A protein has these predicted regions:
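N-terminal (or domain-start) structured segment
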Residues: 20-91
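Ligand-binding clefts/hinges and TM-proximal coupling segments of bilobed small-molecule sensing domains
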Residues: 137-154, 226-299
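Pocket-lining segment of extracytoplasmic ligand-binding domains
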Residues: 86-88, 95-98, 126, 163-259
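Extracytoplasmic
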Residues: 25, 56, 66, 76, ...
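An extracytoplasmic/periplasmic, membrane-proximal ligand-sensing/linker region
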Residues: 171, 175, 182, 192-206, ...
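Bilobed "Venus flytrap"/periplasmic-binding protein-like clamshell domains
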Residues: 25-53, 57, 116-182, 297, ...
Length: 317
């Protein structure tokens, strides 16, 4: 997998960026995530939709570590589009955390995908009920360079905490779940969608699953200190898990100012006109609508020019 990934990136670094008019079809390279999450399913289904219905864009997806790596690949002009949570993209634009001293400029939003959430997964029989109960415990906070890690660091910072509040581990979600099943981890942080195939496997195993959110005071503090996050009630897609009070934001697909206007416009058109087909292929596309994209107007990260143009054409400002 990594060899294939490297080859794709090498070719993308050297290929010229040509307009649709010059090239006939724009070759869009789309950074997804690991194969375990909703984002990968969304991106691969959307690429198929583009290839089936666009006369001007040809799309292909690559696996990545997710939001943080995609932002870096966009900044390096190694991909044309990539998924990212708004908290990670905002952190990069502000030049904070991993981007301290070298903020990423020129990011824009092509479309809203779905809501994202922060939650904590522990074994079903765990005595932990709150974040505080995990102080000093063995907790996975995500792979460094990945979106889960960046999101969690920002949330901990908003609470006045650091990684060393726990005994931190830096594993992928799938590896963290395996470690938890072996008794080597006490908790796994998730920052992303309300479902994850690795967490579903955890729930189905003898270890079982309990999901922890945040207390009202923690939610208030987080949202006061990080405006990219809002209080939310997460209806988890894990059977038998009750709604979880937590914080969340938006998963979007991003580009930079280098993506031609006509390409981002075409992507929005395909997403809108063939939305029913998209939802048939992946239910995670249900909320990927022009109205939800328009709701992101006015944030730190602007909508792409092609997106704004398309929204005006269909009467959504």
């Amino acid at each position: 997998m990594m060899l294939i990934f490297s080859v794709i990136l090498l070719s993308s670094c050297t290929r010229p960026k040509q307009s649709v008019e010059e090239k006939g079809k724009y070759d869009l390279l789309f950074g997804a995530s690991s194969t375990a999450g909703m984002a990968y399913q969304w991106v691969t289904a959307f690429c198929e939709l583009i290839n089936d219905h666009s006369d001007t864009v040809q799309a292909s997806a690559i696996t990545t570590l997710g939001s943080s790596e995609n932002i870096n690949l966009l900044a390096a002009n190694e991909i044309d589009a990539g998924i990212s949570t708004n908290i990670v993209a905002s952190t990069a634009m502000l030049g904070e955390a991993d981007w301290a001293g070298h903020p990423v400029s020129g990011l824009n939003i092509v479309s809203y995908m779905y809501a994202d959430y922060c939650y904590i997964c522990v074994p079903k029989n765990s005595p932990a009920e709150t974040l505080e109960d995990l102080c000093g415990k063995r907790v996975n906070i995500g792979e460094k360079g990945g979106g889960v890690y960046t999101g969690m660091v920002e949330i901990l910072k908003a609470l006045g905490l650091g990684e060393t509040y726990f005994k931190p581990y830096y594993l992928s979600v799938s590896d963290a779940v395996s470690s938890m099943q072996d008794g080597a981890l006490d908790a796994v942080f998730i920052y992303g969608s309300a479902t994850n195939s690795s967490i579903m496997e955890l729930q189905a195993s003898k270890t079982g699953l309990k999901v922890i959110g945040f207390t009202p005071d923690e939610i208030s503090t987080i949202c006061e200190n990080n405006t990219a996050l809002k209080p939310v009630e997460m209806n988890a897609s894990y059977e038998g898990i009750p709604p979880v009070s937590t914080v969340g934001g938006a998963m979007c697909f991003m580009a930079t100012e280098k993506l031609p206007v006509e390409v981002s416009h075409e992507l929005c058109r395909i997403l809108d006109e063939y939305h029913d087909e998209f939802v048939t292929n992946t239910r995670w596309a249900e909320t990927s609508t022009p109205a939800n994209t328009a709701g992101l107007t006015g944030g730190l990260i602007p909508l792409s020019e092609g997106t704004a143009q398309y929204l005006r054409e269909i009467g959504i400002d």
